[in-house]
Amino acid sequence: MSLPAAFVPGFVMESPSKTLTDAHFLFFSGLTGDVHPIHYDCEYAKRAGADRPLAHGMLLASMTAFGATAVSQQTHGLVFVDQGSRFIKPCYVGDTIRPRLTVERIWQEGKRKFVRLGTEVINQRDEVVLTGFHVYQLQKSSTNEVHHG
């Protein structure tokens, strides 16, 4: 297991921004089977109190994937073990979002070591639309030592 030296509490990683399109909604719907009309039917969305069809919450959550960060290519031995998300504001087709992950803490439980990353998705108006967390277990290196850096 190896982590970059800068991978300490407070370290921030951002993934490239993406502008959401109808294709994102369609692909996500096809992949997951989530075809709820709130995501594609304008009239249904308006009746439900939204301006227009909403992005799938789990589409937004999936965009916080650690593997999408440049830092992930320098980090080895992390196993994804937990996550949570809160959806703060709606997202729509045409919104440009950028995921941000922040190392919140690194701790040990017995012989196992963990990292908790705070997750956020921010829109083009710099509004946080999603907050959450990921927890990763750090696997031991081949010498059974846990290295940091």
What is each of the regions a protein language model found here?
Residues 1-55, 140:
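Catalytic strand-loop segment that frames the active site of acyl-thioester-processing enzymes
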Residues 1-9, 91-149:
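HotDog/MaoC-like acyl-thioester-processing domains
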Residues 9-11, 16, 24, 34, ...:
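A generic structural signal for short beta-strands and their flanking turns/coil linkers
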Residues 11, 30, 58, 65, ...:
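Residues within alpha-helical segments
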Residues 30-33, 69-73, 124:
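Short, intrinsically disordered, mixed-charge
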Residues 37, 73-77, 112:
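Secondary-structure boundary/capping residues
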Residues 46-55, 61-104:
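Hydrophobic beta-strand-centered segment that forms part of the acyl-chain substrate-binding groove
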